Structure formats: structure tokens, C-alpha cells
């Protein structure tokens, strides 16, 4: 077993001397190649070193191990094949896009030509619409103004009619309120004759006070009213209000009073 250790140590020394003698070479890369059994039953991997020079191309600057050289070469070949396959697919896709683009352009040329032919007709229609639209807008504005004015007039007339109708209602309501105010408040118990007489006296006193105040304010008008009430029309009137004619007197007929009495007595 000691001999194996010595052999491994000698190999390591030889490798170190080679690296020192060749300064242009790259750093050594260790690759496991051989396995040896130790006395303890474990595997001690003795790694012989293989030195590879760096190429000037950066593509080739890859760590290559002694045991993995074939694998790396296979990988590189596979990578090249993959790259070529990608290039082929890209070229196919580009060709398809070109052909499809040409077809799309050819299909779009027809509607473009048709649009160019119909363009002047469309512009004429647009100009006609622009001419018609302002006239319609003006007429609609005029109609709106007229309708608003008519609505205002209708509202004003309706309000005036409502005021005319409400005036008599207002007068009736005020009269009812005045009557309600003049009425005495109802008592809880039933009113007696004394309470009724007292209420009548109070009303008479209030009316007399109001008359006196009216006389004091307007004495002339009060006097005129009193005179009109006391004046009696001497001419009698019938039911229709027409004045009755007085019966003829004997003097108006040219007959004396005695003869008249005699005639009357005979008639009796």
C-alpha cells in the first residue's frame, strides 16, 4: 500500500515540474480517471492531470476534462445541429411571412381601389348633410322658442284664471274666519240662559262701540245714512216697485163736496 502512495506522489511531482517548465500553458484541470482502494475500505481518487492549451478563439475556451472529452465534443456537435435547425426554421417562417404579406397586400389592393373610386361620392354626401343639419337645428331652435313662449302665456293665463277663481274663495274664507272669531268659545258645561244673555249684551255693546267709532270717524256719512233711513217715500208702490196713481178727487172732477156725499149715500 505504501508503494501506491509513493507512485501517486511521484506523479504529482512530475506534473508540477511540467507546469513550471511551460509558462504558456493554462492552469491544470483535474479529471478523475482511476480509482484505488485504501486499507480503510474507502475509495481514494487518484486524479492524473492533463494540461490543455487555450486557443485564441473565445468559443473554444471551455474546461475539458480527461474523462469528459468525448461528451463535450458530442455536445458541441449537437449544439451546432440545433443552431442549424433554428436557422432553418427561422428562414422558413420568414419565407411564409413574406408570401403571406404579399397575399395580404394583394387582397387589400382591391378595397383600396374601390374606396378611392367612391371617395368623391362620399364627400358630396357629407357636404349635403352639413348643409341640411344647420337648417334643421335652426328650425328646431325656433320651435323650441315658440313652444316656450306659448307655454309661458298658457301658464300666465292659467295663473290669472286661478287668481280670479280664488278671490271669491278668499273672501268667503275671511268671512268665515271673522264669524268664527266673533263667536264665543264653547264652555265645558252646558250654557245657561244667564250666559246666553251675557253674550248677547256683549255683542250689542261691541256693535254699539263700533257704530260710535264709525260715527266719530265719518260723521257726515253716518248722518246721511240716518236721514235716508228716516225718509219715507210718500207715493205708494205696488209689489213690483211701481208707483201707484192716486184716486181722482171731486175737486179735480169739478163736483162739489155735498153732491159727492149725496151720491155716495144713494149708492149705499
From Swiss-Prot:
Main subcellular location: secreted
Membrane-spanning intervals of the chain: none
Motif annotated as RxLR-dEER, chain positions: 50-71
Subcellular location: Secreted; Host cell
Region (Disordered): 120-257
Biased composition (Basic and acidic residues): 212-224
Alphabetized UniProt keyword annotations: Secreted, Signal, Virulence
Cellular compartments per GO CC: extracellular region; host cell
Biased amino acid composition, Low complexity: 148-161
Record flagged with keyword Signal: yes
Superkingdom of the source species: Eukaryota
Signal peptide interval: 1-21
Entry comment, domain topic: The RxLR-dEER motif acts to carry the protein into the host cell cytoplasm through binding to cell surface phosphatidylinositol-3-phosphate.
Family assignment from sequence similarity: Belongs to the RxLR effector family.
Job description of the protein: Secreted effector that completely suppresses the host cell death induced by cell death-inducing proteins.
Name of this chain's protein: Secreted RxLR effector protein 32
UniProt source species: Plasmopara viticola (Downy mildew of grapevine)
Gene: RXLR32
